[in-house]
Amino acid sequence: MDMEKLKEILLKAKKLGFSDKQIANLLGMDEIEVRDLRKKLNIIPLYKMVDTCAAEFEAKTPYYYSAYETFVYKEQDESNPSDRKKVIIIGSGPIRIGQGIEFDYSSVHAVLALKEMGIEAIIINNNPETVSTDYDTSDKLYFEPITFEEVLNIAEREKEKGELLGVIVQFGGQTAINLAMKLKNAGVNILGTTPENINAAEDREEFSKLLKKLNIPQAEGGTAYTKEEALEIAKRIGYPVLVRPSYVLGGRAMQIVYSEDELIEYMEEAVKVSEEHPVLIDKFLEDAIELDVDAVCDGESVLIGAIMEHIEEAGVHSGDSATVIPPQTLPKEIIDTVIDYTAKLARALNIVGLLNVQYAVKDGVVYVLEANPRASRTVPYVSKSVGIPLAKLATKIMLGKKLEELIKDYDVEKVAEKVWIAKPKYVSIKEAVFPFQKLPGVDPVLGPEMKSTGEAIGIDKDFGRAYYKAQLSANMELPIVGNVFISVRDRDKKHIVDVAKKLHELGFTIYATEGTAKVLRENGIPAILVKKISESPNDNILKLMRDGKMHLIINTSSGKKAKSDGYYIRRAAVDLGIPYITTIPGAKAAVKAIEAVKTGELSVYSLDELDARIKNRF
């Protein structure tokens, strides 16, 4: 085929919206080869301005989209790169379960930091529902897909004039992080933690080697490329195991597996989901307390923004579990160990910017579950809880500022050489916000696969009041009087006794199914027997719920059976707007909240007043 004909076909494909990657797949080529060919043929995107003022007067803060509409390039491109120093921030793209609006918070704070430093802030994002894509947030906005092709196109265009200092990938969630190495190989400077160190944290085998070298405990595990390897690893470390594909966000395709049959079934599903990456198998630490830590590092000094204790048990995805700052049940030696491990990891990975580390504590041993060399979904929560803008600090560090200088204005405590931790003034609780009302038929039970799409915060002087506020913020108003229905799986029956006892003391009337009612009565707690759905199709718990006689539902899942009684009860609670709880730790926290509200007032602050109190201004 002659070059003119090739040029005509390739241009037509680009006009129709085919990406370089799609064209490469169709032709059996590499994406870079298609890119090089396209550029050789002078098929280059131009950027058109969206006039935010509708031609009424000149747009001062325009934003752009790409188009392939002509061979004439320079005359029709409207992006007009400035001659300033500039930085590109990659946004997080569409909101979906696992990657939500929380990441946009970090992108916006990065823009604010760059503006304070006199550097032009350029955002690439394609989600109109975010603050970062408001045309007056950044100096320049490119409304483009978060892909290697589009980011590199924009970087090359902006390099033509002024000084492009680099690209920030830390604030765009996993989508942006996955582009780091390819962009570096294409000659783009990645600001902050290097792509090699990002990979050392993201690649499970590399990270496992690092933990061994640092003498930091980790849950036993392995990487399987076949069903046979998976069965062998699970047999070696013992069931239950947590299985998941590599490189995921939001716990997609993640599952706790209790037997060989379950594992075989999972492998047949997950390997199809994840052909490019192997399946990871870890020992599941039952009844462990999970922790999250958000930290900022300049390669040497470390600031720990907060240690967050998960309220739900291990096995509930970190994005779905309620968390509390400061930790409520951990002894000082555990806190000290977590601080030590976080600082060691930050330095070993040479983190420049943000780091999130997830831990599990079992039998006094602190295990590292994973480290994420990027902004986590908890950065807004931590920043608001302790009054320190972590994303802002991280951005300034990426551009050469030293952490020790930046934290002088904040209330932090030095806990080791070049290690500080923020001092929270209040109890702050994050609660997940779920979309179940908009998803008919979905079981609201919590597990390792993430289901939430947002989060809310409750802040007060003690745990109970803060938890009550967090539930209110997440659209779940806990009752302080009324009827409670309790039905829990066998392994939870001994743990529900204290919860039921407290609810009875607080004046609630308890309804329960046969097995749960028997255990409660044996422990001196009166319970009204309610028939299961399968026992009586017309006179059962669902009828009581529909008649408005139930004010709180406590129901834990009994297993994998898709349409169990528990499923119908939980689903009815969602549809009828009845507060429901699906974990024992969640039930214990709710009881503390109800007791706190029954015995005292909730503290009420304006946002300005609360912000000033958190920052120690009065």
Swiss-Prot record:
Pathway: Amino-acid biosynthesis; L-arginine biosynthesis; carbamoyl phosphate from bicarbonate: step 1/1; Pyrimidine metabolism; UMP biosynthesis via de novo pathway; (S)-dihydroorotate from bicarbonate: step 1/3. GO terms for molecular function: ATP binding; carbamoyl-phosphate synthase (ammonia) activity; carbamoyl-phosphate synthase (glutamine-hydrolyzing) activity; metal ion binding. Mn(2+) 1 binds at Q358, E370. Binds 2 Mg(2+) or Mn(2+) ions per subunit. Residues 478-618 are annotated as: Allosteric domain. The keyword Phosphoprotein does not apply. Its EC number is 6.3.4.16, 6.3.5.5. It catalyses: hydrogencarbonate + L-glutamine + 2 ATP + H2O = carbamoyl phosphate + L-glutamate + 2 ADP + phosphate + 2 H(+); hydrogencarbonate + NH4(+) + 2 ATP = carbamoyl phosphate + 2 ADP + phosphate + 2 H(+). Mn(2+) 2 binds at E370, N372. Mg(2+) 1 binds at Q358, E370. Residues 476-618 form the MGS-like domain. It is an enzyme of class 6 (ligase). InterPro entries: ATP-grasp, ATP_grasp_subdomain_1, CarbamoylP_synth_lsu_oligo, CarbamoylP_synth_lsu_oligo_sf, CbamoylP_synth_lsu-like_ATP-bd, CbamoylP_synth_lsu_CPSase_dom, MGS-like_dom, MGS-like_dom_sf. Pfam families: CPSase_L_D2, MGS. Residues 208-399 form the ATP-grasp domain. Keywords: Amino-acid biosynthesis, Arginine biosynthesis, ATP-binding, Ligase, Magnesium, Manganese, Metal-binding, Nucleotide-binding, Pyrimidine biosynthesis, Repeat. Residues 79-477 are annotated as: Carbamoyl phosphate synthetic domain. Mg(2+) 2 binds at E370, N372. ATP binds at R244, K283, L285, E290, G315, V316, H317, S318, Q358, E370. Large subunit of the glutamine-dependent carbamoyl phosphate synthetase (CPSase). CPSase catalyzes the formation of carbamoyl phosphate from the ammonia moiety of glutamine, carbonate, and phosphate donated by ATP, constituting the first step of 2 biosynthetic pathways, one leading to arginine and/or urea and the other to pyrimidine nucleotides. Belongs to the CarB family. Corresponds to the C-terminal section. The large subunit is composed of 2 ATP-grasp domains that are involved in binding the 2 ATP molecules needed for carbamoyl phosphate synthesis. The N-terminal ATP-grasp domain (referred to as the carboxyphosphate synthetic component) catalyzes the ATP-dependent phosphorylation of hydrogencarbonate to carboxyphosphate and the subsequent nucleophilic attack by ammonia to form a carbamate intermediate. NCBIfam families: PRK05294.1 (NF003671). Composed of two chains; the small (or glutamine) chain promotes the hydrolysis of glutamine to ammonia, which is used by the large (or ammonia) chain to synthesize carbamoyl phosphate. Tetramer of heterodimers (alpha,beta)4. This is Carbamoyl phosphate synthase large chain, C-terminal section. It comes from Methanocaldococcus jannaschii (strain ATCC 43067 / DSM 2661 / JAL-1 / JCM 10045 / NBRC 100440) (Methanococcus jannaschii).
